[in-house]
Amino acid sequence: MLLSDRDIRAEIDAGRLGIDPFEDSLVQPSSVDVRLDTLFRVFNNTRYTHIDPAKQQDELTSLVEPSPGEPFVLHPGEFVLGSTLETCTLPDDLAGRLEGKSSLGRLGLLTHSTAGFIDPGFSGHITLELSNVANLPITLWPGMKIGQLCLLRLTSPAEHPYGSAKVGSKYQGQRGPTPSRSYQNFIKLS
């Protein structure tokens, strides 16, 4: 079941759902707007000949931060990682779904490639997979509304929520745009 604005506010007021910093004006009829943080991860295209999800490639990306008051410019065809300004903490009976903003999608900005799902129990900044599919550069301003977080109530609390020892939650507590850690659970078939 998708939470309404009144349910979202009730979860926040009860201290079960954490969105920090929180502004009530960001609550929409069935979502909460999230804003863009100041940090970005850009790909170092000259460090590797290819991306291998089975290997740890620490120098694949570099962390960059625009000067205060300046935007990050995302050029056509480029892909970078960003993150939400807000730290989001979900209880064990709520899952999240990050969606893009329609107004930004109409400009050619994709907010996530595939990873828009947030497990119950997750706590941290949500990493954004930002792509420009337009024909012109797009300026990304830290603090701008970048997406909307929809919240779904589970039929029962998760037995092993994200962050529990059994799950192997490699992104729990992440701060800023976090690079892929796919190598930590990659299994090659023989």
From Swiss-Prot:
Q: List the disulfide bonds.
A: none
Active site as annotated? 129
Q: Name one GO molecular function term.
A: dCTP deaminase (dUMP-forming) activity
Instruction: Cite the EC number.
Output: 3.5.4.30
Which transformation does this protein catalyse, written as a reaction?
dCTP + 2 H2O = dUMP + NH4(+) + diphosphate
Enzyme type, top EC level: hydrolase
Domain of life assignment: Bacteria
Q: Which GO terms describe its biological process?
A: dUMP biosynthetic process; dUTP biosynthetic process; nucleobase-containing small molecule interconversion
Instruction: Enumerate the residues marked as the site Important for bifunctional activity.
Output: 116-117
Polar residues bias: start-end ranges: 171-184
**What SUPFAM superfamilies does the entry give?**
dUTPase-like
Q: Where does dCTP bind?
A: 101-106, 119, 127-129, 148, 162, 174
Pathway given in the UniProt record: Pyrimidine metabolism; dUMP biosynthesis; dUMP from dCTP: step 1/1
Pfam families the record matches: DCD
Keyword set, alphabetical order: Hydrolase, Nucleotide metabolism, Nucleotide-binding
The record's section on CDD domains has:
trimeric_dUTPase
Identify the stretch(es) annotated as Disordered: 162-184
As for what it does, the entry says: Bifunctional enzyme that catalyzes both the deamination of dCTP to dUTP and the hydrolysis of dUTP to dUMP without releasing the toxic dUTP intermediate.
Similarity comment: Belongs to the dCTP deaminase family.
* Subunit and interaction comment: Homotrimer.
Its protein name is dCTP deaminase, dUMP-forming
